[in-house]
Amino acid sequence: MDANTKTILFFVVFFIDLFSPNILFVYAREIGNKPLFTYKQKTEKGPAEWGKLDPQWKVCSTGKIQSPIDLTDERVSLIHDQALSKHYKPASAVIQSRGHDVMVSWKGDGGKITIHQTDYKLVQCHWHSPSEHTINGTSYDLELHMVHTSASGKTTVVGVLYKLGEPDEFLTKILNGIKGVGKKEIDLGIVDPRDIRFETNNFYRYIGSLTIPPCTEGVIWTVQKRVLYFFCFCYRLIIFVTPYINIFWIFVFVFWCMLM
């Protein structure tokens, strides 16, 4: 099959993906075969019901500053904060599936960010697809969260949004780990968080919450304004290693590999 035909097929598949959000059904935090909560809207364990599923999750329904949100100029601050600085460095890391996402955890010292003279140590990063935050109503294909904690137990999360395009350096380097990921940790060796390319020159800042139960509030969110790109192969792999009931995309992926 020639290159033009492959290109046409890719864009047909892409636009089906873009306009078919109901194809994907996400289940998370399983005990045995029973999920504790899901991401599927309008179900008994979907986001609107999280606060009723466990007394410790009550704030998911009653909270006043819940995340994610639509990032608009009227709602949040778009700033260049001189009081924010990043000090990341390469360190040993592992990758695993948590059921609701794929997570890279730094076992060594991956560095920190400093916000208003408070240090927050980098703990882990994970992905959500499609993006949880939107910018002026626009959703993106992928969202990376870099989770940090302070010595006093406070949490700050850096969010980076992605859309399909050129290969992403960070995802490309951990691709083999993503391919084999499961509930058990896989050693990635040394992983450099600087490859994520989080920029501090323009970002959205607001106080919100964790985006999964128990939806704890008081989280400092920093979401980069610039949207990055990533290659579709990494995108599909991340989707496949999370528990999506997605027979359609399994078929598409196998078919596409046969054409390569």
Swiss-Prot record:
Listed CDD domains: alpha_CA_prokaryotic_like (cd03124)
Catalytic reactions of this protein: hydrogencarbonate + H(+) = CO2 + H2O
Secretion signal, residue range per the UniProt entry: 1-28
Keyword Chloroplast: yes
Single GO MF annotation: zinc ion binding
PROSITE patterns in UniProt: ALPHA_CA_1, ALPHA_CA_2
Residue span(s) of domain Alpha-carbonic anhydrase: 35-260
SMART domains reported for this sequence: Carb_anhydrase
Cofactors required: Zn(2+)
First-tier enzyme category under EC: lyase
Residues binding substrate, per UniProt: 211-212
Enzyme Commission code(s) on record: 4.2.1.1
Glycosylation (residues): 136
PTM: N-glycosylated.
Keyword field: Chloroplast, Disulfide bond, Glycoprotein, Lyase, Metal-binding, Plastid, Signal, Zinc
Positions contributing to Zn(2+) binding: 126, 128, 145
Localization per record: Plastid, Chloroplast stroma
Active-site residue list: 100
Reported function: Reversible hydration of carbon dioxide.
Official protein name in the record: Alpha carbonic anhydrase 6
